[in-house]
């Protein structure tokens, strides 16, 4: 087989494992970023890789680069995927992304089929590995004449327990803005056969302790819209369908207070355009009578709700740790959300030697053909290499490696369906699961627990 070549768009933290897996397989990779510096940094010392500067908004430049390669990987923000896919359709080249298929991408399905190309999506961790093991159990149960009555799927990218040493029990390996914005999303899911909707401001109040292993104090809350999964996973019989997020205990209560006091608002505020002391910014955001810590705290306590006095103390201490009552100058970003993000990113980074953790678990409540009931779980618990050791974070590995394996399989014809795809059937999924398990040790452990 002639040497294949791939155009990889993006240089974010998940791109390195993808680059390594592909170049180790002898595939040539052109690393393309807006800035040449970022592309050079990612490809430094990697055989078979070439850095270039590319603006995906420039159709002519994008088409010219796509034309030189067999496949394009889009690891840039999902809002650009449709632009990339359109270019690939024009040039008749395959595409792989790790993002959810958006309506704008799905609209290109017929054009992709007509061009004879595969546009493979949702093949990272979540979405990605989660689909592989959800479909596996669902297809097995259906083949045996059983029914899936409940499907719960929770995933969290977290600091390892020993590194969860701040009031949120959370650290940022990428933009904190995206993490915080997700906490304002409304959620929809099936409960007892009915669609349940939760408004964005109420999301954190719905978080509940969630048992996976005794050694972890997780809480879980629903993620955006789980209702399409009745159809996507072909489980019309399911009464309960929830896909959600895992965090450590204490996280939702802390975030809920930030919401209550106006810190997650992205409304422009003139006073947040200058580097004023945090206590003055906080006084104005919470509308306290003065910038003294006492006045600010009493305003926060009266505007937010707390489950107990003990929790109130913990959260107020956490806000103090963040520095929002202090004389320290803010990094002005024009609104409360982004100004807070600047401080979170400064105080809540992973430090040298710390590790991240990814936990993913599906829980299936099954009614067997004979009417008996059982509960099965599929669980993945992965720790990253310590920061600074040169290894991958758990999150980077679990997004980047499945992406690379999908690229290899599209190039060699193992994945041969055309159009806009996601891993939703065993024909696509079985080879991916086999390769991920046998070659990279990536698998969900399956158990019958009740």
UniProtKB/Swiss-Prot annotation:
Signal peptide: none annotated. Its EC number is 1.5.1.10. It catalyses: L-saccharopine + NADP(+) + H2O = (S)-2-amino-6-oxohexanoate + L-glutamate + NADPH + H(+). InterPro entries: AASS (IPR051168), NAD(P)-bd_dom_sf (IPR036291), Sacchrp_dh-like_C (IPR032095), Sacchrp_dh_NADP-bd (IPR005097). This is Saccharopine dehydrogenase [NADP(+), L-glutamate-forming]. The gene is LYS3. Pathway: Amino-acid biosynthesis; L-lysine biosynthesis via AAA pathway; L-lysine from L-alpha-aminoadipate (fungal route): step 2/3. The lineage of its organism: Eukaryota, Fungi, Dikarya, Ascomycota, Pezizomycotina. Keywords: Amino-acid biosynthesis, Lysine biosynthesis, NADP, Oxidoreductase. It comes from Pyricularia oryzae (strain 70-15 / ATCC MYA-4617 / FGSC 8958). The keyword Transit peptide does not apply.
């Amino acid at each position: 087989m002639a040497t294949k070549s791939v155009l990889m768009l993006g240089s974010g933290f998940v791109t390195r494992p993808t680059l390594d897996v592909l170049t180790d397989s002898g595939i040539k990779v052109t690393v393309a970023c807006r800035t040449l510096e970022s592309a050079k940094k990612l490809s430094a010392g990697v055989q078979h890789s070439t850095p270039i500067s590319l603006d995906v908004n420039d159709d002519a430049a994008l088409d010219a680069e796509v034309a030189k390669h067999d496949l394009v990987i889009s690891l840039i923000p999902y809002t650009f995927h449709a632009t990339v896919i359109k270019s690939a359709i024009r040039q008749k080249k395959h595409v792989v992304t790790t993002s959810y298929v958006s309506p704008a991408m799905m609209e290109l399905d017929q054009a992709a089929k007509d061009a004879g190309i595969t546009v493979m999506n949702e093949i990272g961790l979540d979405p990605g590995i989660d689909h592989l093991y959800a479909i596996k159990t669902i297809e097995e149960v259906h083949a045996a004449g059983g029914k899936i009555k409940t499907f719960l799927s929770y995933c969290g990218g977290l600091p390892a327990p020993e590194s969860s040493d701040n009031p949120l029990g959370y650290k940022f390996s990428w933009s904190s803005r995206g993490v915080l914005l997700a906490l304002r999303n409304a959620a929809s899911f099936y409960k007892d056969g009915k669609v349940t909707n939760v408004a964005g401001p109420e999301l954190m109040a719905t978080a509940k302790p969630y048992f996976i292993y005794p050694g972890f104090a997780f809480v879980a809350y629903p993620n955006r819209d789980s209702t399409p999964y009745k159809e996507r996973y072909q489980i019309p019989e399911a009464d309960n369908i929830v896909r959600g997020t895992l965090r450590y205990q204490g996280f939702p209560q802390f975030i809920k207070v930030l919401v209550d006091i106006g810190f997650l608002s992205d409304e422009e505020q003139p006073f947040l355009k200058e580097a004023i002391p945090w206590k003055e910014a906080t006084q104005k955001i919470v509308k306290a009578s003065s910038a003294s810590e006492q006045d600010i705290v009493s305003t926060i306590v009266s505007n937010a709700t707390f489950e107990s006095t003990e929790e109130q103390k913990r959260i107020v201490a956490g806000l103090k740790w963040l520095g929002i009552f202090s004389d320290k100058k803010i990094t002005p970003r024009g609104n409360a959300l982004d100004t807070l993000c600047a401080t979170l990113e400064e105080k809540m980074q992973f430090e040298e030697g710390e590790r991240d953790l990814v936990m993913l678990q599906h829980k299936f409540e099954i009614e067997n053909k004979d009417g008996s009931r059982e509960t099965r779980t599929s669980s993945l618990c992965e720790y990253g290499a310590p920061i600074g050791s040169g290894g991958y974070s758990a999150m980077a590995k679990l997004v980047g490696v499945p992406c690379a394996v999908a690229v290899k399989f599209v190039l060699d014809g193992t994945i041969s369906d055309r159009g806009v795809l996601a891993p939703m059937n065993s024909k696509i999924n079985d080879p991916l699961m086999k390769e991920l398990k046998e070659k990279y040790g990536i698998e969900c452990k399956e158990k019958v627990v009740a």
